[in-house]
Amino acid sequence: MSNTANTGAFEGHKKLERNVTLLAALTLGVVAIGGIVEIAPLFWIDNTIEKVEGMRPYTPLEQAGRDIYIREGCYVCHSQMIRPFRDEVERYGHYSLAAESMYDHPFQWGSKRTGPDLARVGNKYSDAWHVQHLKAPRSVVPESIMPNYSFLAEAPLKVPDVAANLTALRHVGVPYSDKDIAAAKTDLEAQANPEADAGDLAARYPKAQIRDFDGDPKRVTEMDALVAYLQMLGTMVDVNSAAAQEELSGKPQAGEKGK
């Protein structure tokens, strides 16, 4: 009886596999149902990313640095996503919040780490350390396999149309104001030159760090932009008082109980 039932089921499935039209229709139906189950709930959610106080769009200089970061492939070896595991929190700091990537296009979470995670590297090291590390990585981290990026200190920062970059980002949801866009070129140059008139740059971009980043105040280089970007990472949101941090630090992970 069992063998007969199994044979019947097999024959029925064989007919389904041989009928391309029926198989395609059923496959489409299953995919459609799965898509509805995944997508439908989003229509009842006001925002999939919870807003966090302190988040702001990148300054033009930070954005230029981020573009260089992507251009040079830094994201291939460095993630920007600290997972909510005790070992990662103890090494890198508070786990990453979704809101911290809300203005990233594309995001820089990363899927592997050849080097350390950089989500909270901002203000962890001095500008001089970053410059030296980028010029000659093994002079500060002997075991590093990172290539040298000394050419960044010699390359003048060239952004053909800063305002157009910010305008494009505004089209995909980054809330740059008309004033931000109009002052983009001035803001980019002023942030790396402490002697320049930065106007209301600090007011429009809270916590923006205004100084010479590469040690050469006479010009703005690609090194200035990249270091400005690195020094900003993880500094916008105050996570020191987050209850989740205390909870994570106080509870044993799976497998630790009883040790």
Task: Describe the role of every protein-language-model region.
Residues 41-64, 79, 94-108:
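Sequence context of c-type cytochrome heme-c attachment sites
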Residues 81, 148-152, 231:
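A mature extracytoplasmic/lumenal domain signature
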Residues 23-32, 90-222, 259:
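Electron-transfer interface patches adjacent to heme c in soluble/periplasmic c-type cytochromes
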Residues 1-58, 194-199, 203-204, 229-259:
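Post-cleavage N-terminal segment of exported redox proteins
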Residues 77, 143-149, 237-246:
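Surface-exposed patches in mature extracellular/periplasmic domains of secreted proteins
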Residues 65, 71-80, 130, 226, ...:
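The canonical Cys-X-X-Cys-His
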Residues 46-70, 82-85, 89, 114, ...:
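Electrostatic cytochrome c docking/interface patches
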Residues 72-76, 81, 114-117, 145:
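Short pre-active-site segment immediately N-terminal to redox-active cysteine/selenocysteine motifs
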